[in-house]
Structures are given as C-alpha cells and as structure tokens.
Amino acid sequence: MKAVYLCLCMLAAFCFSAAALPADCSQVIVGSADGWNSSHVQLSLLEKGPRGWVMVKGPFPARLGKSGLVWGRGVSMPPSGGPVKKEGDLRSPAGIFELGGVYGTVPVPQKKRSMPYRRITPRDMWVDDPASPLYNQHFVLKHDPVTPWEFKQQMKLNDYAHSLKLFIRHNAASGREKPVPGAGSSIFFHIWRRDGGAPTAGCTAMSEENLRAMIAWLDPSQHPLYILLPAMEYLRLRGAWGLP
C-alpha cells in the first residue's frame, strides 16, 4: 500500500509548479524530508542578500507526521491527481506555505519586527471540526469553555510540546477564501516530544532551542515562507527558485 502511495506522490510531483517565489520573499525555511513516508526532516533557514540566498542556520533535525508527507494547500496548490492532506491522516502537508502568528503559554522576547504573538488563555480555540464554519481558524470564546465541543477545540494549555508554536498556513483562510472542510487543520511548528524520539500528528516539531531561534529570526516584512518537500523533490526544484 505504501508503495502505491509513493508512486502516486512521485507522479504528482512532476506536475508540481516550480513558479518563482514572491519577489518580496527574502526568508525561507526549507524542510528536506527523507521521503514521502518518512517522519524525519532536516530544516534550514535561508535568507536572501545582495549575493543571493545564504544559509543562516541549519540543517538541524525535526520531526513530521507519523505517516510522512502528503500534498497540502498553501501558496502552491496540490498537483492534479496526487494524494492530498486530509484531517486525521497523520501526514504533514508538503508544498510552499506562508506563516501565521506565534502562540504560546510562555513569554517570547519581542523585537521591532517580530511575528505576531498571542499568549494562550483557556478561552483560545483552534477548530479541527470540519462541520464548523470556523474550521482551521483561531477564535476566542466570550466565556470560559463549558461544552464538550468547546473543551475539544481548546488550544493546549498544559502540554510542553505546545507551549510555543508557530502557525503554518496550510488550508488557511485568506481574504474570501475559506479553509476546505476536512482538508487538514492545526498545522504548526512546535516543540518536539521525547527529544525528537516521537513523530507528530502532522505538524513540524523541533527542539525548543531551535524553535526559539527560528521565531526570533523571522521577520514578517520579509514575507517568510516554509517549503517542505522530500529531499529528491527539493533538489529537482530548487534551481527554479534560486535556492541552494
């Protein structure tokens, strides 16, 4: 079954668009995974200067979804005919993604140009219910959670791995575009479990030290993006993006 899945992903990869990155993008996080069915990835932080793209940190290890990768919905749309991200499939979305805000239960030092940060409270929700009009969106209750549904959607408060996280804008609301129900929700960069000994449910996880360094480096005015692909696909496409 995994062999069939791998073939479908590889065939779809040849249809994946390698269009130029946005002109105002000068920061990129590159995730180079061991393969479509691997939960292991190497992350690198790249910045564009007068002489082109240079690596400012990495590569360093991180973990992906337990079942590996699948095409996601971001700046790039999934290739036609390829397997796509679904809610609960334990796969991390592959492609090119914008970044959202930082959320956490711990303080984050703020600089002049920082990613927006919100301190999580018991009223902060992130909806993973495909039947909800607020699917894959953050909202704040006007009261403390009461119903089982509200408790289920509550952002994690007492979980070290989720004490600091950065939203990856997979299947995210944008202008009039709403998230596609069931196409995957709550995809973040966050702290890994068991010092990297455990995969995720679809997020990208790393050490707290590396996560904090990455968040401190990011500058929203530089339109940072996350590119996540199997290593062989990244090597095939990086030239079109001018990346090392």
What positions do the PLM features span?
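Cell wall/extracellular polymer interaction/catalysis modules
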Residues: 19-201, 209-244
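Positively charged n-region of N-terminal signal peptides that target proteins for export
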Residues: 1-4
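Bacterial N-terminal signal peptides
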Residues: 7-15
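A conserved hydrophobic position in a structured secondary element of the catalytic/binding core
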Residues: 206
